[in-house]
């Protein structure tokens, strides 16, 4: 895990591609016209609260959205990007793994319409997924190929 995930610095939030075998856990955003990307598939995560570190922000968001305790050892890749909502600020994107058992234990919160597993190949090509998240996940795949 990258050390900066435990550091306090100025960032807007964290999004996580949580892999369950060869699939990614995705959440269908609420269909409300006053939110960015309504009725679009996205990844768990959200905005920073107070002086949270990226890891603390991610763990809180995953707990609130999915009822899962995400251990830092689950994180396999991360990178800092420009925020999707404020290009002058930073956001963090992580890739992590959860087990089939953890997936079955999800208690879906009150943000979003539904969650599901989407095959990796579908996620990177699908219409109706936030494009920036697709691009960030592709960066992980490219980096993984280079490392192998």
Which functions belong to the PLM regions below?
Residues 11, 19, 38-43, 87-91:
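Short connector loops at helix/strand junctions that flank enzyme active sites
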Residues 8, 16-17, 32-33, 83-84, ...:
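Short secondary-structure boundary/capping segments
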Residues 34, 38, 108-148:
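Nudix hydrolase/Nudix homology domain
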Residues 69-79:
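A short coil-to-beta-strand element that immediately follows conserved catalytic motifs
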Residues 23-64:
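Conserved Nudix-box catalytic region and its N-terminal flanking loop in Nudix hydrolases
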